[in-house]
């Protein structure tokens, strides 16, 4: 392992010394987006721009912004867009989606979750958000089997950043207060400070969310070639849980019923910090280096009687309330160089981190026998290196290839029962992966681009999968193999001036040992997975943006897919929670500070069990949005689900053949006012 890292750094240093200097214009560091280090120009992605972020951000969980993009759906716990939100790209859940913040890993490294609820009002501190669909082989951190989400924090050296106060209120006692201060760059210094408090009762009974956030980003710009900045994002949130559904009979009696009980709450604090230095070493060589630290502490409560009642019907009362404690920290660093050599662009980089998470159950729980107490620690080590070479033989042609080596290992310490402890070599929890990809673009005319790409990626099982959904190791591993994903994409982009943009993308993803949902949940509340013998996901995605006249716009996207898997028990069936059709449309008018429009969101029915006997119906909403700018004020109003349609974001099947539904809110609104200083 040490030899590999040494060779990588030797190669990077040699590259810096041997490259020929080019007579080029000095690039402005403010314009360098870190995500551009990790991708070629061939992408199947959607970008939320700074203007979009300003217009659509009202404190909602980012998952619900992603759901307006092709092939993406969002789910929620409490029936609203606040609190816990989840998202799936092409039917693949967020543990298969790589998330980075300024190139630094965001996912927690044991179960690969990426919970934006831990960082309330995240979007108020972002410059852009890029969502890439399809397997990616050059991400930092966990494997991006389904795609990647690249968060780019606000540019503190931008003269156009506004300081403002924001206040909103809406249905279910939803409210948000935010203050943002953006200092105009002064003597090389930049500063961004944000403080937010938001609350909602939630649509579900006692499905509340109470969140606070504080973010600071500051840095110094030495000149046009050198910048350094520090970012600290901190969030605290408390929730009434809602991860258990209800039967239709319960929802007919009380549409706002919650499958969880009132005593099942959680408390979390999360802090994400990073220090980043960027420089143009020469006119052709760009370097970025970062160190980062992530910390989270909290617990969630679990009522065993309620769980047994909902999932199994008949049960023996235990009168137990578990309080599962979790505390983790992650420390890491990355280093990237991008070198421009005439028709070639070479990018190389290294990322590594160590992650430790403590799991504990103690006397904060109620009526739990002392012998059930546990305390253990999982430690994850992850080191990866990658190289990407892009070649432009002609102005109209681009080809590129990338390769990544990734080493991952998991160790476990049981502080109560030492016999259950193990290291990475004891149980095969050490993996060496080689991921790679190829891309090609052809632009026959300025308005048209034809592209194709292929990626091959490997992913190891999560801790929860290996432990069978238990919070502590019981001595037996679930027999799961790493999954292998292959993804071929082909598409065409067409642009007609500033009037029309169209993208049509075809994809074929096939897997070996894909870890698919089996419809069951562990005692830790996380869904369980099994290896499929074989599986695939094929589809077409269409994205169109049309400026009908100067002030009237129409955006529409849709996808159609076939998603199959083969298992020993059920044979060939459809994937769970994977709709065959998704569609979104937005018709809006924007003129002289006034914006008004209607948008709609749809996805087809989804199966919730491996036998495909049970499903939840299609989802469709019609929404209204408007805003008006007057001098330093901006007023906005959003009304969701205008038709008051009954929608279910997801469902699960219990052991006695009942579907437990997660019902979304009916017609609801949020209104806001923003004052720019």
Give the positions of each predicted feature:
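A beta-strand signature from Gram-negative outer-membrane beta-barrel systems
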Residues: 120-164
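Short acidic/polar hinge/loop motifs at secondary-structure boundaries
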Residues: 88, 105-133
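N-terminal periplasmic "start-of-domain" segments of outer-membrane beta-barrel proteins
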Residues: 26-59, 86
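Face-selective signature of the C-terminal outer-membrane beta-barrel domain
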Residues: 225-229, 233, 267-419, 432, ...
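Transmembrane beta-barrel wall of Gram-negative outer-membrane proteins
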Residues: 169-199, 204-240, 265-285, 293, ...
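Surface-exposed extracellular loop regions of Gram-negative outer-membrane beta-barrel proteins
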Residues: 238-255, 358, 363, 407-422, ...
């Amino acid at each position: 392992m040490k030899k590999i890292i040494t060779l990588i750094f030797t190669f990077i240093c040699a590259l810096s010394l041997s490259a020929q200097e080019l007579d080029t214009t000095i690039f402005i560091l403010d314009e360098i987006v870190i995500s551009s280090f990790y991708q070629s120009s061939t992408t199947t992605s959607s970008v939320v721009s700074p203007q979009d972020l300003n217009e659509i951000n009202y404190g909602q969980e980012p998952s619900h912004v992603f759901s307006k993009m092709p092939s993406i759906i969002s789910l929620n716990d409490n029936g609203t867009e606040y609190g816990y939100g989840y998202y799936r790209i092409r039917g693949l859940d967020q543990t298969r989606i790589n998330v980075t913040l300024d190139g630094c890993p965001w996912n927690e490294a044991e179960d690969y979750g990426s919970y934006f609820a831990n960082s309330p009002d995240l979007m108020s501190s972002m410059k852009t958000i890029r969502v890439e669909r399809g397997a990616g082989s050059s991400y930092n951190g966990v494997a991006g089997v389904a795609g990647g989400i690249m968060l780019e924090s606000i540019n503190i050296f931008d003269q156009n950043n506004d300081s403002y106060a924001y206040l909103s209120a809406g249905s279910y006692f939803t409210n948000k207060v935010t203050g943002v201060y953006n200092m105009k760059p002064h003597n090389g210094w930049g500063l961004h400070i944000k403080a937010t408090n938001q609350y909602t009762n939630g649509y579900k009974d006692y499905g509340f969310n109470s969140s606070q956030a504080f973010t600071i980003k500051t840095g110094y710009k030495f000149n046009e070639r050198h910048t350094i900045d520090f970012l600290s994002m901190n969030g605290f949130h408390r929730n009434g849980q809602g991860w258990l559904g209800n039967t239709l009979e319960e929802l007919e009696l009380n549409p706002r019923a919650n499958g969880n009980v009132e005593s099942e709450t959680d408390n979390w604090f999360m802090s994400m910090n990073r220090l980043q230095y960027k420089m143009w070493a020469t006119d052709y060589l760009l370097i970025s280096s970062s160190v980062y630290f992530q910390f989270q502490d909290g617990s969630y409560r679990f009522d065993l009687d309620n769980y047994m009642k909902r999932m199994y019907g008949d049960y023996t009362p235990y009168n137990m309330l578990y309080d599962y404690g979790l505390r983790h920290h992650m420390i890491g660093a990355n280093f990237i160089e991008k070198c421009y050599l005439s028709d070639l662009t070479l990018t190389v980089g290294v990322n590594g981190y160590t992650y430790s998470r403590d799991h504990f159950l103690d006397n904060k729980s109620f009526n739990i026998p002392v012998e059930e107490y546990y305390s253990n620690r999982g430690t994850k080590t992850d080191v990866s290196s990658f190289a990407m070479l892009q070649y432009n033989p002609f102005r109209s042609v681009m080809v590129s290839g990338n390769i990544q080596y990734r080493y991952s290992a998991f160790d476990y310490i049981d502080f109560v029962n030492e016999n259950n402890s193990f290291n990475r070599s004891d149980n095969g929890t050490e993996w060496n992966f080689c991921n790679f990809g190829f891309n090609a673009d052809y632009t026959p005319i300025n308005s048209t681009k034809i592209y194709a790409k292929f990626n091959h990626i490997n992913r190891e099982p999560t801790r929860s999968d290996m432990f069978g959904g238990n919070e502590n190791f019981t001595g037996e591993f679930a027999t799961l193999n790493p999954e292998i994903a292959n993804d071929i994409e082909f598409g065409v982009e067409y642009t007609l001036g500033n009037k029309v943009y169209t993208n049509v993308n075809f994809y074929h993803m096939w897997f070996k040992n894909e870890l698919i949902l089996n419809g069951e949940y562990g005692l830790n509340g996380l869904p369980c997975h099994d290896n499929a013998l074989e599986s695939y996901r094929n589809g077409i995605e269409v994205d169109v943006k049309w400026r009908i006249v100067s002030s009237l716009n129409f955006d529409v996207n849709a996808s159609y897919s076939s998603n199959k898997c083969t298992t020993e028990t059920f044979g060939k069936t459809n994937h769970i929670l994977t709709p065959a059709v998704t569609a979104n449309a937005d018709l809006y008018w924007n003129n002289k500070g006034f914006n008004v429009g209607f948008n709609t969101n749809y996805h087809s029915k989804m199966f919730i069990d491996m036998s495909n006997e049970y499903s939840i119906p299609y989802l469709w909403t019609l929404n209204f949005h408007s805003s008006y700018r007057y001098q330093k004020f901006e007023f906005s109003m959003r009304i969701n689900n205008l038709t008051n349609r009954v929608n279910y974001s997801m469902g699960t099947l219990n052991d006695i053949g009942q579907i437990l539904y997660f019902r979304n809110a009916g017609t609801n609104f949020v209104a806001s006012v923003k004052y720019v200083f």
